[in-house]
Amino acid sequence: MSQSYINVIGAGLAGSEAAYQIAERGIPVKLYEMRGVKSTPQHKTDNFAELVCSNSLRGDALTNAVGLLKEEMRRLGSVILESAEATRVPAGGALAVDRDGFSQMVTEKVANHPLIEVVRDEITELPTDVITVIATGPLTSDALAEKIHALNDGAGFYFYDAAAPIIDVNTIDMSKVYLKSRYDKGEAAYLNAPMTKQEFMDFHEALVNAEEAPLSSFEKEKYFEGCMPIEVMAKRGIKTMLYGPMKPVGLEYPDDYTGPRDGEFKTPYAVVQLRQDNAAGSLYNIVGFQTHLKWGEQKRVFQMIPGLENAEFVRYGVMHRNSYMDSPNLLEQTYRSKKQPNLFFAGQMTGVEGYVESAASGLVAGINAARLFKEESEAIFPETTAIGSLAHYITHADSKHFQPMNVNFGIIKELEGERIRDKKARYEKIAERALADLEEFLTV
């Protein structure tokens, strides 16, 4: 295949990472992004790697699978991780970022790379004669989605994804909330709105009876469990809320708390957490409260949360349809297409779920697109690593039951020898082996 550059289509998390990895290997890149020419309902700017759901990249500890994945990506020179570290905001033991600052930094690093040419245009055909990484994400334009759908033998998959509302911090009644991280882990990074049992029951009733924005009549409601609308959780029952986004454990009242409580209990019946959304600390999002309620209903119901009675919503929660491929049948472990070998796919459309996972898939696809360009052997990352196990899972899962997957220790190859019973010790050992195997892999 004679060519002088590689195409990358889509400048989200996966596409930005793929383009950067290719360019860092000395290969010119044409990075296509349709925003600027054609917008989507969910994106607010034309910047690359815009975060449309949460601003959290989740846990940072190596005993957390996504923490291990992030460490592997750091060692591989990830532009997404570098930008995230530079724009992080307080979030306890998690890595959360200033939403706008993060996407702006990624845009600057990628667009200003001397080997990357940014083309603001919509691509409607799958290239056949140029090595191309397709990372158009869950919001792929209809024209291109149709071509990918055909590659998929017409058998597309989808689920619904939702985002949480964002609030102006100056409109929160600080006398009714308190600053604390669960179990006092890390710095006190979350505002906590405690509820008594009666307050929770009233809130739950209002939530389950609130009016949702309509879906297309021909589409079934299918949700990814990790980003399920709060009203759907509420309809599953009270315990789903109390063991999910509103769980109170580890969030005891502070000694100086004077608000309402149930008797002498030291822990609230339920807690709503708010997490800082930008570096200035002027915006907070409601953690786990992704929603598809009508906007008027969001205001009515969420203003029942203590401290949010007069809250101003700078962005209401929204929901969008995510499409993904039959990766077990369509992709190699390198994210290369089995049916059209000049194509690589990356991001949520491949069935990886989550910001970090999307960027990781872009990193692997970019590395392998560059290796194909240079006529080098493909790089299949070890299944003992988080990055390798994720690539292996989405390309080897049972196609009939394939659903999007977050990185987790369950998909990473088991340790050899006797099973370590202590979970933390076992995860530490898996992480230690993963990083050692990654270093060895990179030296070969």
From Swiss-Prot:
The keyword Transferase applies. Transmembrane segments: none annotated. Its EC number is 2.1.1.74. Its cofactor is FAD. It comes from the Bacteria. Keywords: Cytoplasm, FAD, Flavoprotein, Methyltransferase, NAD, NADP, Transferase, tRNA processing. One of its GO terms (biological process) is tRNA wobble uridine modification. Coiled coil: none annotated. GO terms for cellular component: cytosol. FAD binds at residues 10-15. It is an enzyme of class 2 (transferase). InterPro entries: FAD/NAD-bd_sf (IPR036188), MnmG-rel (IPR002218), MnmG-rel_CS (IPR020595), MnmG_N (IPR040131), TrmFO (IPR004417). Pfam families: GIDA. One of its GO terms (molecular function) is tRNA (uracil(54)-C5)-methyltransferase activity, 5,10-methylenetetrahydrofolate-dependent. It catalyses: uridine(54) in tRNA + (6R)-5,10-methylene-5,6,7,8-tetrahydrofolate + NADH + H(+) = 5-methyluridine(54) in tRNA + (6S)-5,6,7,8-tetrahydrofolate + NAD(+); uridine(54) in tRNA + (6R)-5,10-methylene-5,6,7,8-tetrahydrofolate + NADPH + H(+) = 5-methyluridine(54) in tRNA + (6S)-5,6,7,8-tetrahydrofolate + NADP(+). PANTHER family: GLUCOSE INHIBITED DIVISION PROTEIN A, METHYLENETETRAHYDROFOLATE--TRNA-(URACIL-5-)-METHYLTRANSFERASE TRMFO. NCBIfam families: gid_trmFO, PRK05335.1. Catalyzes the folate-dependent formation of 5-methyl-uridine at position 54 (M-5-U54) in all tRNAs. This is Methylenetetrahydrofolate--tRNA-(uracil-5-)-methyltransferase TrmFO.
